[in-house]
Amino acid sequence: MPHVSLQNVTKLFGEDTIALDDVSIEITAGEFVVILGPSGAGKSTLLRILNGLTEPTTGTAQIGGSPVSESGSDVGMVFQMHYLIESLSAYRNALTGALSRTTNLKSILTLNQTDDKRAALRALDTVGLLKDAEQRAGTMSGGQKQRVGIARALVQNPSLLLADEPVSSLDPKAARDVMRYMKQAARERELTTVASLHQVNIAREFGDRFIGVRDGTVIFDGSRAELSMDVIDDLYYAGSESTPVSHGDIEGQGEGLTKPDDTSVSSDMETTSGRDHSTGTDTGTDTGTDTETDTETDTGEAQL
């Protein structure tokens, strides 16, 4: 049984706008799938259907053999905008991911259960931000904020992680950092991951399988080796009078294909909750485009 299944899904907005047109996709547990396509192709609509934020007009969407509406916290979502509470620490923002796992008013008000705290710290460690757990979100770079967004989704303990253009506003270095940590989280936690990206170069580095969407229709479904320049030209430039361009030009950086950085952070999570945050293992610098300079500090947030 596939972990994710879309069968003959069509989504209409109004009477005339077709966002998705008879889309059928099956995704196996543990796959890291990247959805490619030009703006307005239907990528975000597809992810919103998988997350239960919108319903298909016709067709069925299932996760683990059950309707998406029954999946609840089994689905974690990373958005294009991080939607962090910038006055709170990275730790407190990650901790809000626990809200999806309870409807108990007392739990929502306190968010201080030991298991939730441990989950938040483990998630920050997974994305290389444990040493920055007490830093206010408003003082972080764009790339760091997106990594906190990933951590927040991981606190839900999902089996499916969705990411809608998570690196579209970042420079290539920060984008690769975010994608590397996302790929690492998927590997460590055996997550099924579906991410929409428009940077073809970065997508090729991290995806295992690629689904190309154009005008609401799936026109390609294959491996990295099968994602040829002809496929990319057809996906992005079919019907256009513009000259097809290179992989790097699509990304906007004019660079060739490169292999992902294999650097990883510590996977020893059993003692995370007792670790000094100054010993967290963040690899490399983050040059995200968000450069807010709020210098207030958030103290003592992550103490158990």
Swiss-Prot record:
GO cellular component, one term: plasma membrane
E.C. no: 7.3.2.2
Chief localisation class: membrane
Listed GO MF terms: ABC-type phosphonate transporter activity; ATP binding; ATP hydrolysis activity
Coiled-coil intervals, chain numbering: none
Acidic residues: bias regions: 289-304
Keywords: ATP-binding, Cell membrane, Membrane, Nucleotide-binding, Phosphonate transport, Translocase, Transport
A Pfam family of this chain: ABC_tran
Region annotation Disordered: where it falls in the sequence: 240-304
Domain of life assignment: Archaea
Compositionally biased residues, Polar residues: 263-272
Domain called ABC transporter: residue spans: 4-240
Binding residue positions for ATP: 37-44
Annotated localization: Cell membrane
SMART domains: AAA
InterPro entries: AAA+_ATPase (IPR003593), ABC_transporter-like_ATP-bd (IPR003439), ABC_transporter-like_CS (IPR017871), ABC_transpr_PhnC (IPR012693), MetN_ABC_transporter-like (IPR050086), P-loop_NTPase (IPR027417)
Membrane topology: Peripheral membrane protein
Reactions catalysed: phosphonate(out) + ATP + H2O = phosphonate(in) + ADP + phosphate + H(+)
PANTHER family linked to this entry: AMINO ACID IMPORT ATP-BINDING PROTEIN (PTHR43166), PHOSPHONATES IMPORT ATP-BINDING PROTEIN PHNC (PTHR43166:SF6)
Function, in words: Part of the ABC transporter complex PhnCDE involved in phosphonates import. Responsible for energy coupling to the transport system.
UniProt family annotation: Belongs to the ABC transporter superfamily. Phosphonates importer (TC 3.A.1.9.1) family.
SUBUNIT field: The complex is composed of two ATP-binding proteins (PhnC), two transmembrane proteins (PhnE) and a solute-binding protein (PhnD).
UniProt name for this protein: Phosphonates import ATP-binding protein PhnC 1
Source species: Haloquadratum walsbyi (strain DSM 16790 / HBSQ001)
Source lineage: Archaea, Methanobacteriati, Methanobacteriota, Stenosarchaea group, Halobacteria
